[in-house]
């Protein structure tokens, strides 16, 4: 199960609203683009989304989550946060400003020594968030 699925499960169990948040820096360095050209609106290597209109980001990021929420009778609010802060800071700020009770965040599976460490975004959110944080591998 991924973080979104856990979030949906918890929202269903506790009859809570689910906020699906997409946070990304507003400007992403062109070195991460498939063709190294920021004007082409290509997606970021690794499946991310960059420099797309807000409605396209929402559609690409939230379509599966919205469908799963509908199937499970879970109220979902979708938000896109594109600022010049770090992704972790944007998540933390959003949670504080919107009285979020629990943050469910995913982290990439690691092996060996790296398994002992969280990703930088998840680690910062766990460290600085005002509310409990559930990290899903």
Model regions: which residues?
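Conserved beta-strand termini and adjacent loop/short-helix elements that scaffold enzyme active sites
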Residues: 23, 79-81, 136
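Structural beta-alpha unit
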Residues: 27, 63-103
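A short acidic, glycine-rich active-site loop
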Residues: 40-60
């Amino acid at each position: 199960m991924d973080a979104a699925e856990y979030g949906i499960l918890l929202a269903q169990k506790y009859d809570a609203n689910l906020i699906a948040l997409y946070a990304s820096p507003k400007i992403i360095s062109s070195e991460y683009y498939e063709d190294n050209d920021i004007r082409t609106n290509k997606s970021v290597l690794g499946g991310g989304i960059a420099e797309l209109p807000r409605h396209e980001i929402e559609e690409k990021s939230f379509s599966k989550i919205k469908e799963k929420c509908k199937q499970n009778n879970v109220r979902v609010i979708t938000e896109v946060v594109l600022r010049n802060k770090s992704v972790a800071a944007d998540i933390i700020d959003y949670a504080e400003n919107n009285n979020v009770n629990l943050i469910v965040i995913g982290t990439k599976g690691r092996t060996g020594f790296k398994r002992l460490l969280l990703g930088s975004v998840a680690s910062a959110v766990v460290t600085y968030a005002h509310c409990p944080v559930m990290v899903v591998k």
